[in-house]
């Protein structure tokens, strides 16, 4: 252990010295250069079929390899006991199976991994046990099957290296600390930055399960799971709107109201469920954020007459009563939905349960189609609870 600690200390000193001499460069936003496959030992044979996802692509290549492209990053997934092709372009990161002792920083990636029964591949977490809302992930950490290895900006390099980490799965927050990504790669740990949160279609977000199927040899399971989830909401697709208007929001501590943009996946789920999103013209304002903060006056003007209010507990905490809601924002007492008792609150697990979006769509459909809030059978709801 002392030799390992000394080695890690030396490696860290060398790595940080390198960082001082070579500052991290900004992440390029240009599309990736194509590999010169005429000089490599593999060829692209066909495109892996994806129906909805736009933020990643997969090419099926010779020798059973898969070439994954996520924005401007490329990853070649090589089967176990297979030789890595020669002549690869320098921008391609090799992921040699089996991928074990994964350092999982992106919380939205845990749910698809759990659904594929691939949790044993994850032994390191960037989220502490108390911040997991997925019972299996929380229990695995409490039982010592998964160790906390530091958040995205401050990983425990010694723990990660000593665990023989085979892959770090990050989200785009890592680009705020590019030196961390660089350090992990200097230790020989490939870093995959997933972008499922940039998908504007709920089905596209769920289709990322296919990427994890490729990484963890669960392709058939991923296809089956995804198709089953799509079938659950297919009866709702193409149906006429219920005419119910809805708002998905939360109130910040500094008296602003956070709502989803009109092109966001939550707004699209409201439409799939038969509702009409109140902020249908709230388009992009030049950043990649899915939300926007409105003043109380702006929110009041547009949302006062909404039929249904859905409070997002994942940001500012859960509310159970109208009194709690009004303590956050007294002016909501004037709102039609508050006066009619048609206010609902999400569970705090909502965004970590990234593969259960059909349940939220079905929950909202039950609310939108009910004759009154009291007619909704709450035992049938997974993500929504009635604010009494």
Where are these predicted regions, by residue range?
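Extracytoplasmic ligand-binding site segments that recognize negatively charged/polar headgroups
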Residues: 100, 108-114, 125-136, 176-179, ...
């Amino acid at each position: 252990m002392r030799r390992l600690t000394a080695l890690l200390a030396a490696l860290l000193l060398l790595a940080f010295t390198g960082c001082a001499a070579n500052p991290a460069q900004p992440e390029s936003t240009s599309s990736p250069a194509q590999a010169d496959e005429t000089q490599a030992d593999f060829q692209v044979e066909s495109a892996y079929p994806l129906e909805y996802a736009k933020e990643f692509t997969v090419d099926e290549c010779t020798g059973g390899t898969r070439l994954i492209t996520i924005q401007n990053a490329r990853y070649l997934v090589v089967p176990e006991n297979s030789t890595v092709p020669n002549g690869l372009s320098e921008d391609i990161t090799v992921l040699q199976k089996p991928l074990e002792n994964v350092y999982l920083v992106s919380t939205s990636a845990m749910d698809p991994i759990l659904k594929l029964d691939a949790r044993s591949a994850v032994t390191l977490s960037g989220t502490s046990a108390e911040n997991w809302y997925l019972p299996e992930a929380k229990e695995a950490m409490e039982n010592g099957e998964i160790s906390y290895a530091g958040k995205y900006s401050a990983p425990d390099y010694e723990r990660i290296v000593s665990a023989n980490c085979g892959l770090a799965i990050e989200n785009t927050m890592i680009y705020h600390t590019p030196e961390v990504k660089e350090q992990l790669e200097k230790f020989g740990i490939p870093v995959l930055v997933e972008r499922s949160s940039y998908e504007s279609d709920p089905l596209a977000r769920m289709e990322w399960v296919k990427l994890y199927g490729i990484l963890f040899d669960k392709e058939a399971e991923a296809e089956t799971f995804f198709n089953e989830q799509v079938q659950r909401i297919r009866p709702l697709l193409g149906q006429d709107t219920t005419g119910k208007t809805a708002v998905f929001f939360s109130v910040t501590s500094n008296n602003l109201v956070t709502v989803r943009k009109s092109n966001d996946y939550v707004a699209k789920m409201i439409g799939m469920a038969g509702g009409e999103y109140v902020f249908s013209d709230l388009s992009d304002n030049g950043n990649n954020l899915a939300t926007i903060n409105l003043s109380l006056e702006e929110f009041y003007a547009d949302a006062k007459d909404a039929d249904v209010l859905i409070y997002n507990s994942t940001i500012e905490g859960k509310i159970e009563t109208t009194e709690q809601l009004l303590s956050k924002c007294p002016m909501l007492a004037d709102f039609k939905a508050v006066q009619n008792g048609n206010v609902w609150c999400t569970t705090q697990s909502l965004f970590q349960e990234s593969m259960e979006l059909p349940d939220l769509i079905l929950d909202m459909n039950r609310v939108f189609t009910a004759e009154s809030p009291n007619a909704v059978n709450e035992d049938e709801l997974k993500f929504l609870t009635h604010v009494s």
